[in-house]
Amino acid sequence: MESNIILVVILGISIVGKATSVAISVAALLILKLLGLDKYIFPYLNDKGMFWGLVLLTAAILIPIAQGNVKAIDIKNNLVSFVGITALVLSFLTTYLSGVGLRYLTVQGHSDVMPSLILGSVAAAAFLGGVPVGPLITSGILALLVKMVKKS
């Protein structure tokens, strides 16, 4: 019951904060719980959900290439530009941070910080016009900061 209340609070905040993807996700989880399907679907989502979410996100990002809107010459020209090189470096960094964050949340068992990560993402979406896709990167930064503080 407590988990339902927490999810409803996150749902309300995400609706007010106009974080539609978070609201849909929370609503889907609540519906699955209310229908009693959580015991069947949650284990699969817990195990494979992140992978399939990343597959869909990556596929969506690659659509312009698949549609032929991006040519090989465009990629070549971009890769040698300041923006292209910066994109490569930042992509390398954020991908690394996402991996650190995923391990921090799952393997290291710090999933209790997820509500704070979600609320921060929702607040940024509401007040700064952001898109709430950064909890893994945020948790990666958090994991590195926690590690540095513990060493001090």
From Swiss-Prot:
Q: Which InterPro entries match?
A: UPF0756_TM
> What is the annotated localization of this protein?
Cell membrane
Keyword Transmembrane helix in record: yes
Where are the bilayer-spanning segments? 5-25, 50-70, 82-102, 117-137
The family note in this entry says: Belongs to the UPF0756 family.
What is the protein name for this chain? UPF0756 membrane protein CA_C0092
Membrane topology (UniProt):
Multi-pass membrane protein
GO CC, one annotated term: plasma membrane
> What keywords tag this UniProt record?
Cell membrane, Membrane, Transmembrane, Transmembrane helix
Does the keyword section mention ATP-binding?
A: no
PANTHER family in the cross-refs = UPF0756 MEMBRANE PROTEIN YEAL (PTHR38452:SF1)
What's the superkingdom here? Bacteria
